[in-house]
């Protein structure tokens, strides 16, 4: 069976509550992006508060240009676990490049485990839910190195 996930782990010198607060704030996601795609939310975004919450994020990739992702919170356990699944906003200009292709089914999840004031953070990128074979061919969309960079940036953002 093909493995459809990658992950990276880092210990951050901060309590889980502080790490979780940064991850739960979409306004800070540009500071965390190890792949260089996240440009920020439209205006001021509310903090994430539970499974099913939706937030949008402006993105950019060379070759695709500017686009917007609609993210749905898929995991939410305060100070322990948070994650979301992105899907392209069908109303953004770049969506026409994917007409007829289901560009959903992948998730980003962070698991936090605190010990002695420090937090072990594991970021997992998973695409087991991708149903469209055309879309699945281009996975993974990020690398383990991107996840490692993201964790390094998270450590800096937590301060």
What are these regions (language model features)?
Residues 12-14, 63, 90-92, 127-129:
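Beta-strand elements of well-folded, non-transmembrane domains
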Residues 3-11, 17, 54, 68, ...:
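Intrinsic-disorder/low-complexity, polar/charged segments enriched in Ser/Thr/Lys/Arg/Asp/Glu/Gln
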Residues 99-104, 120-159:
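A conserved amphipathic terminal alpha-helix motif
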Residues 56-58, 85-91, 124-128:
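Generic short beta-strand segments
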